[in-house]
């Protein structure tokens, strides 16, 4: 927007603000109800917001937990696709759902870093890596807002576990905040989200909703955000302090806040200028909403369903395959596990989606693609038994499944978590699958050497008790309402899997950056600093079950002809990628920067670029990347900005963080 346009808009906002009384301006700073702003008898347009990142959750008298809605793959599945276009298309589809429901702002996406795999909301978040999270979130927002529906980027900031999230302070140092936890927000801000939502938790002892260092100094001054900041629902503790920190709209309506603001003005805790600045930002948002009306055109339902299916397929990660996949021809395969019939489409809490209709069973979807095959189904466990101390009928189910597995060519076990075990407000107590599921996997593995385990979960799970006893492992995540169609497509070979892990799968909880610690209820120190996710495992040379960026295919890819050219603007990296197999497929080329020497402790390597490349069998393609000076930088607490240290850097190209195929070096002068 030009300076002239900005000034014109400012004058219009001033005229609109002049129509509001002093009390109306204060009332504008808190919502009119649960999810909408004040209109003052038609003086202002109403802004309506709704959850959530995987599909709409709109509560009604008839549907108190949310009216039936279309369910899309969860954000972590979009990140596992490693394809920003997938996230953009899902954003466009979600915008269509909002348009039909009269929603102006979707309360998504969340870009909080997956600091611990136990966090109950990890399924809502993209990655343990800020670059991958930021890139995917930016595309999600671009898609959503291209159709005239605003995004609410959340939860700013350092909201990385659900346990005691309302009270426990995240004690994080400035460098760690800027390099890891604020970084995905900074990248997503390139998409100009309409709003940003603050977190519930305190940061360095001050609630995020009223933290001037966090909202004013970091978000607005350092990151350059000048839009509306809204609260998470019930996150405001002192409305005047929140306003002083530049929080604009409190959700939901809080009757006491009006008196709090009046008292704040009387006592000088806030100034009228603070009110006017916030009102101006809100009016600009309302005007943006009105101007977006002409872009609000919903996609056809059939197109949205295809987007959901494509995203679920592309986000599936093949973790192990001893040759049993893809399934072919006249084959008899036992399909076991209640989740095969009643899949985990998404997690619980505000991101929960009430399905329009139950997904088609996995056995039925496999039969469609392999009509000569047989796919008998046995539960083997019921999910209620996984959460109760006694499961009296469990042994009978396992006995039947054992016999069926013995009589089959292969057996598929669908295991994982659901909306009760991965949900807002609670963290998981363990990385392990429910014991009944592990027992079923091990029992079938004793009867059949071709056991295929499908895992539906929103974050890493501990597979060590059974991973080496099965023939294949497929990580589907929470794939939305099309999850079984997507799974059948991959298992049958109709789709070649191309997903990669957006987080490390550790060998044990004690190996993770946070270990088994979770704070004391009052505060939690981010002692690992910038060594989040794979940075931690690589720095300490820890073995992992599956590394960040890992994922198999039904074909093979070769990397060759590496070129690294240093330029005034940074560096140009290129290589040749070849599909060396007999099946078309896609590979994610990942570029990591490795500082050889540094004045501060730095991660061994960090992701700085990636591209998903689709190749026919035998096809080759030249893939190029541009690295900027900022890709070599770290945050200096001395200068309070990102700086580049002079010295030698390695540029690594690979198929995962631990599968480096090509390597080059360059020397930078740096800032000092």
Q: Could you describe each region identified by the protein language model?
A:
Residues 1-637, 643-658, 672:
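Glycoside hydrolase catalytic-domain context in secreted enzymes
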Residues 660-664:
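Extracellular and select intracellular beta-sandwich modules with Ser/Thr-enriched
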Residues 665-671:
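Short beta-strand edge segments in extracellular beta-sheet folds
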């Amino acid at each position: 927007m030009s300076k002239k346009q900005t000034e014109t808009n400012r004058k219009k906002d001033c005229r609109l603000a002049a129509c509001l009384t002093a009390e109306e301006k204060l009332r504008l700073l808190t919502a009119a109800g649960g999810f909408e702003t004040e209109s003052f008898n038609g003086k202002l347009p109403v802004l309506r917001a709704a959850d959530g990142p995987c599909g709409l959750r709109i509560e009604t008298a008839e549907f108190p937990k949310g009216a039936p809605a279309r369910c899309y793959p969860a954000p972590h599945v979009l990140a596992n696709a490693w394809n920003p276009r997938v996230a953009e298309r899902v954003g466009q589809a979600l915008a269509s759902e909002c348009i039909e429901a009269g929603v102006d702002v979707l309360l998504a996406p969340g870009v909080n870093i997956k600091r611990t795999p136990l966090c109950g909301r990890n399924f809502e978040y993209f990655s343990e890596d800020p670059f991958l999270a930021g890139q995917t979130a930016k595309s999600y927002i671009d898609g959503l807002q291209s159709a005239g529906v605003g995004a609410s980027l959340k939860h700013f900031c350092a909201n990385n576990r659900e346990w005691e999230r309302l009270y426990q302070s995240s004690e994080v140092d400035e460098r760690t905040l800027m390099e890891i936890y604020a970084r995905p927000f900074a990248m997503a801000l390139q998409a100009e989200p309409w709003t940003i939502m603050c977190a519930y938790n305190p940061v360095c002892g001050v609630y995020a909703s009223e933290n001037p260092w966090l909202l004013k100094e970091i978000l607005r001054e350092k990151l350059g955000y000048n839009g509306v900041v809204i609260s998470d629902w019930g996150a405001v503790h002192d409305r005047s302090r929140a306003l002083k920190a530049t929080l604009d709209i409190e959700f939901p309506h809080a009757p006491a806040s009006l008196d709090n603001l009046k008292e704040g003005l009387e006592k000088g805790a806030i100034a009228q200028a603070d009110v006017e600045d916030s009102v101006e930002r809100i009016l600009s948002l309302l005007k943006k909403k009105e101007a977006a009306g002409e872009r609000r055109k919903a996609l056809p339902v059939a197109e949205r369903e295809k987007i959901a299916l494509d995203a679920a397929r592309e986000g599936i990660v093949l973790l192990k395959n001893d040759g049993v996949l893809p399934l072919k021809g006249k084959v008899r395969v036992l399909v076991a596990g209640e989740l095969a019939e009643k899949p985990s489409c998404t997690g619980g809490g505000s991101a929960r989606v009430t399905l329009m209709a139950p997904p088609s069973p996995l056995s039925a979807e496999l039969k469609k693609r392999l009509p000569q095959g047989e796919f008998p189904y046995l539960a083997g466990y019921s999910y209620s038994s996984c959460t109760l101390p006694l499961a009296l009928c469990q042994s009978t189910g396992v006995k039947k499944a054992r016999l069926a597995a013995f009589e089959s060519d292969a057996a598929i076990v669908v295991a994982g978590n659901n909306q009760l075990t991965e949900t807002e407000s609670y963290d998981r107590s363990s990385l392990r699958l429910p014991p009944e599921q592990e027992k079923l996997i091990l029992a079938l593995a004793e009867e059949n050497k071709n056991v295929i385990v499908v895992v539906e979960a929103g974050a890493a799970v501990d597979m060590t008790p059974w991973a080496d006893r099965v023939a294949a492992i497929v990580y589907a995540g929470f794939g939305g309402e099309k999850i079984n169609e997507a799974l059948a497509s991959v298992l049958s070979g109709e789709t070649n899997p191309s997903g990669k892990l957006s987080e490390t799968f550790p060998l044990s909880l004690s190996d993770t950056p946070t270990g088994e610690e979770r704070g004391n209820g009052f505060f939690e120190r981010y002692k690992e600093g910038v060594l989040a996710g794979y940075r931690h495992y690589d720095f300490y040379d820890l073995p992992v079950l599956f590394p960040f960026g890992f994922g198999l295919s039904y074909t093979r890819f070769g990397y060759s002809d590496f070129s690294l050219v240093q330029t005034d603007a940074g560096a140009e990296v290129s290589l040749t990628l070849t599909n060396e197999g007999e099946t078309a497929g896609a590979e994610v080329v990942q570029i990591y920067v490795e500082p050889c020497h540094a004045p501060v402790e730095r991660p061994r390597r960090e992701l700085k670029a990636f591209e998903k490349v689709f190749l026919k069998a035998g096809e080759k393609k030249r893939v190029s990347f541009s690295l900027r000076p900022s890709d070599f930088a770290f945050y200096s607490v001395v200068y309070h900005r990102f700086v580049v240290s002079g010295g030698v850097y390695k540029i690594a190209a690979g198929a995962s963080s631990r599968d480096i195929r090509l390597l080059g070096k360059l020397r930078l002068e740096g800032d000092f």
